[in-house]
Every structure is written in structure tokens, then in C-alpha cells.
Amino acid sequence: MAKKIDGYIKLQVPAGKANPSPPIGPALGQRGVNIMAFCKEFNAATQKLEVGLPIPVVITVYNDKSFTFIMKTPPASILLKKAAGIQKGSSVPNKTKVGKLTRAQLEEIATTKEPDLTGADLDARVRTIAGSARSMGLEVEL
């Protein structure tokens, strides 16, 4: 018989740096989940990723207080800032440009984000990422 789902918890946790402090501890603690078990499993799963890269994770909590989790790809904005070498996007994206990205960089980000994007082909996914880049004040070379 399948386990009954008690709820879902959505968090962004830095890769390899999950620990019981906020926001992880309180979010899992109020559902009765073993916090250290999650931290150990998450850190083991993110071992191959760049340390500190925020990873969105959806934790499914069951009635018997067990859990499973699904990791998503890092947010596009973080990948774009890393590729452009900037700390933050433009506060006035239409007027002030803060960086420039080539099509090759956009394709690399689109292939990284492929599982989470809905585009039919690579070109559609690149256009999606390019739109995010423009809204951050980055110049895009397509």
C-alpha cells in the first residue's frame, strides 16, 4: 500500500551546505521530519555540484514522518549572473545594461536547465533564457 502524503516543503538550499539551521530546520521540524537525515542525504546528492550553488528542492513528507526529495536545476537568474560575471542584475533593465552574453553561453545555460524548461527544442529554450537575461539588464547576442 502506498504511503499517505502529509505535505510538501519547497526550499532553496545551497549545494553541499545543508544544515539544521534556518530555514531548513524549522521547515522540516514542524512536519516532524528527521532534519539531520535530510541534511546528510541532500549533501550526499549535491556532492558533485558546485558548493554553495542554490538548488531548489521539493520535499515530500509522508504520514509516517519519512520523506523523499526532488532536486530541480539552479535558478536561471543565478546561472545568468555567473555566466555574465556580475553580482546583481540592473535596477533599470531597459536603460542600464550590466553585462553581455553570447549565444553559446545561453545554449549552455539552456541545456543545464533543460529538465525544468518547457521549450520544444534548444532554440525555444535559448529564447526563454534570453528573455530572463534581458529582464535582468543583460545584453543578448542571438
Swiss-Prot record:
GO biological process: translation
Highest taxon listed in the record's lineage: Bacteria
GO molecular function terms noted in the UniProt entry: large ribosomal subunit rRNA binding; structural constituent of ribosome
Post-translational modification: One or more lysine residues are methylated.
PROSITE patterns: RIBOSOMAL_L11 (PS00359)
Keywords: Methylation, Ribonucleoprotein, Ribosomal protein, RNA-binding, rRNA-binding
Subunit structure: Part of the ribosomal stalk of the 50S ribosomal subunit. Interacts with L10 and the large rRNA to form the base of the stalk. L10 forms an elongated spine to which L12 dimers bind in a sequential fashion forming a multimeric L10(L12)X complex.
HAMAP family, A to Z: Ribosomal_uL11 (MF_00736)
Protein name, UniProt field: Large ribosomal subunit protein uL11
Taxonomic source organism: Acinetobacter baylyi (strain ATCC 33305 / BD413 / ADP1)
